[in-house]
């Protein structure tokens, strides 16, 4: 069992215990120690530093207001060499085609740079993005298959790409 709680300001009091009670009510028991992502922030920071050493991430000072309705980041800060402190950290989305097969939704492909752009791994306020945390934790936990709702399907390409950058199988 993993509690994905990196976005601490959005956590409702008591939600963790409610989740665990629901799991138990359905007859499931954790087979290992419960992982709380909020306790692993240093690990995610280390991965960001690893990507920084490889020149695969950069600091970004653009705000949501500056980006407006454009959902694909144009790379405005990509070559500015801004300091990492108090900035968002983005991964460089290369011009690659990422494909996967979903058992229910079929084959999906995205041209990363054009359809997803450079996406955030860490917000300006220090909160680690879901994409990074789950990729690192899935790898460390040996998770190879993920069941997700159709509303989260568009996260898959980002996660595959991050796994490739980190040389995860």
Question: Where do the protein language model's features map onto the residues?
Answer:
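Active-site cores that bind ATP or allylic diphosphates and position pyrophosphate for catalysis
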Residues: 59, 64-169
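N-terminal Rossmann-like or analogous alpha/beta NTP/dinucleotide-binding catalytic cores
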Residues: 1-72, 151-168
